[in-house]
Regions:
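Short beta->alpha hinge that forms the Motif I/post-I loop of the SAM-binding pocket
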Residues: 37-42, 82-83, 108
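Conserved SAM-binding loop of SAM-dependent methyltransferases across substrates and taxa
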Residues: 19-31
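Core SAM-dependent methyltransferase catalytic element
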Residues: 142-160
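S-adenosyl-L-methionine
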Residues: 36-77
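Conserved S-adenosyl-L-methionine
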Residues: 28-33, 97-99
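Conserved class I S-adenosyl-L-methionine
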Residues: 9-18
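C-terminal substrate-binding/active-site "lid" region of AdoMet-derived donor-dependent transferases
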Residues: 91-148
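Conserved alpha-helix/loop element of class I SAM-dependent methyltransferases that forms part
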Residues: 1-8
């Protein structure tokens, strides 16, 4: 979330919101947040998490991006947690709605990483890539090992 450099006045989108963890975190900081999610089960989890954390400034927009984003207020900051292979269309819509929007895309696949950088640069943004790695400890006999988990890439974009 730090990568988005959000301010209290910002309107935020969380596209491909999943369970809404990013949306809730943004909402708890006082931002107006629109969680966009297409899967019914995930939408139900977002509703439950919104109630659990009293994040009433979190609005759920059920549907597929980018179409589901058309009627939302123009964003200042956008987190893309899932794109359904429509990243170019989603990012193009974001920039059309607000050419100064700050964007962060999460990726676990190298193809998504490459596409995010290409799309952001093609839209006149500077792309910055951060890799996040986590290792979990495991005891094997008298040894303690750290087993690496799959890395996550965060691609942030700011207008040049």
């Amino acid at each position: 979330l730090t990568k988005l450099a959000v301010t209290p006045q910002d309107i935020c989108w969380d596209v491909g919101a999943g369970t809404g963890s990013v949306s809730v975190e943004l909402a708890l900081q006082g931002r107006s947040v629109w969680a966009v999610e297409r899967q019914a089960e995930a939408c139900e989890l977002i509703r439950k998490n919104r109630a659990k954390f009293s994040a009433w400034n979190l609005h759920l927009q059920e549907g597929t991006a980018p179409e589901a984003c058309e009627t939302l207020p123009a964003p200042d900051a956008v987190f893309v947690g899932g794109s359904g292979r429509r990243l170019q269309e989603i990012l193009t819509l974001v920039v059309r709605r607000n050419p100064k929007a700050r964007i962060c895309v999460s990726a676990i696949a190298l193809e998504t990483l490459q596409e995010a950088v290409r799309c952001l640069e093609g839209l006149g943004y500077r792309a910055d890539v951060t890799q996040i790695s986590v290792s979990r400890g495991k005891s094997v006999g008298q040894l303690h090992l750290l087993l690496a988990q799959n890395p996550v890439f965060l691609i942030t974009g700011e207008p040049v």
